[in-house]
Amino acid sequence: MNNSKIYLFFFIFILYGFIFSSCNSQAKYSVDIQGHRGARGLAPENTLVGFQKAIELGVTTLEFDVGVTKDGIPIIFHDVAINPNICLENNGNPIKTDSLGYGPLIKNLTLTEIKSFDCGSLNPDLIRFPEPPRQNYPSERIPTLQELFELLQKYPNKNIWCNIELKTNPNYPATYPINEFADAVLQVIELNNRANLVNIQSFHWQILEYINDQQSEILLAGLVGTSSYKSVNDSTPSPWLNGIHFEQVGGTSLAILEEAKQYINIFSPSWRLIDPTDNEFLGSSVKEIQSAGFKVIPWTINTTRIMKKLIDEGVDGIITDYPDSLKFVLEKFNIPQK
């Protein structure tokens, strides 16, 4: 073989390797853009107008919260009670609150009563969500889960995923019991044939185990905050982790996930828990958690610097109030979205 053929062969070999490597890299590092409560930094949270905004921006997943009304209807709202910082009475007056500043419990209100609140006129935090870019939409109502699924039917080619957080609290039983709560949500999912287009997440891991027993097809995400994993004492585990004692099983995020692997598929932590340089780091890297079979989708990341840092760690997705910023980062560094 003469020198020219050797050089040609070598060039083709290198080019093939580069192309293969690039394809592999793109497949490995594609990122799921999850709009937190729709696009909370740009529009009222957990509203149809906010979800539509997120879809128009190109999210691959809508992340939102669900409660259940007095008449058993799953509605999309973050808190167990009507939040006076987010909603107004229909006449524009402030929400009536109790001595602790809470509005009426979702579970004590019918859907008709829920629909009477204006949840589009207020910005709950002008410092965190400056205007612009955020816009208010007066008279926007709290949507039902069914109404969101009907909105998604208008985008049949987008295959928008839903990340549904169930808002139950083991320390504050202000909702339906977990079985009734979960059953109401599952019924709407099944009615709309969306079991293969949703996952359900919760800080309250007991409800995740219940859902897995009822509908094993649905992917489940274990949420963990910077304190929810901590045991009460040496003999009493955190009430959030379904009986798993963080310190006793090994004291790392991967250790508690291994204890719950029968029903948890996705680890969804506060981003600080998976950042090795942060003092809240729980001892398991993104790669270690993924190698054990779990996807990693942290929350809530609103700065492009942290977005890029977590992308470099290899996370599967990012939950953000500003999906437009995440999309910008992905495009800037030529990283495909899922």
Language-model regions, residue ranges each:
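Intrinsically disordered, low-complexity segments
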Residues: N2, I19-F20
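Hydrophobic alpha-helical segments, especially transmembrane helices
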Residues: I6, G17, R37-G38
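Phosphate-group recognition and catalysis centered on beta-loop-alpha active-site segments
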Residues: C23-K338
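Bacterial N-terminal signal peptides that target proteins for export
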Residues: M1-F10
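Bacterial N-terminal signal peptides
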Residues: F9-I19
